Amino acid sequence: MTLLRPAQRGASFQLMTLTIHRLSGTLGAEIHGADLIGGLSNAAFDEIHQAFLDHKVIVLRGQNGLSPDQQKAFARRFGTLNIHPYVKGMDDHPELMEIIKEPDEKTNFGGGWHSDMSFLEEPALGSVLHAIDVPPYGGDTLFADQQAAYDRLSDGLKKTLEGMTAIHTASKEYGADGYSAAVRQSMDAKSAPDAPEYEHPVIRTHPETGRKGLFINPAFALRFAGWSRKESRPLLNYLFDLSREERNTCRVRWQEGDVTMWDNRCVWHYALNDYHGHRRHMRRATINGDKPR
């Protein structure tokens, strides 16, 4: 079956047994009718995979009771799974991270714009996050489309950035004074003051769709290759500001049982920390990717 492209669709449309509703005009869609617990047919998986490529962020509603093994089985249909180098996974499922904020904690994990694992030589393809316990309000996740941000650049700036590379490292976030290293109350995270640095293109071509997008982020992009941090800061900040403009974003309002998947090759995300006094418990699988080009 040939799937419709987003430009051919309205705000809501039916594909076989799945119903897909767009979350914004730029990116994001929620999907009803998928059963990750019972398992997906090849046809249903193909629909979900296409929606993932089309919308970059997909929310699979109604997956209450999804087990760790079932979550891993779904994620593995996209690729092999990553074991986080700085955050301890579950004892029986090291590929899965439990992201927990207890009612008495003030700092959350992922509370700033970033792309998962861009500090690796082969950054993550995508992340699959399951909502186990959600607060009565707040705790939403924002997403920002880096291909849309690239499309808004002038031709002159696109030409300037083409061929440039940036240095990515975990030391900004997981260093001794880094934000993520401070989140050690309900999560076992270690510091990485001597984390390696890897060089990635500033403009990345998506390996499956061929679309170009920015591939830098505030958490892990340290500087442009061959530039000092001071020299890099003005241009990086301009690109960061453009990337997170509201017109490039969508918002996921979590419901218990949701499974949200996003494409780290072209999307940033930001977990909002506006639910103090309430518990939030998520479980994440991260899918290995390839070397950016």
Task: Cite the ranges covered by each PLM segment.
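Fe(II)/2-oxoglutarate oxygenase catalytic core
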Residues: F13-Q14, L18-M261, R265-R293
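Generic N-terminal simple sequence motifs
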Residues: M1-T2, E197
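Leucine-biased recognition of intrinsically disordered, low-complexity hydrophobic segments
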Residues: L3-L4, L15
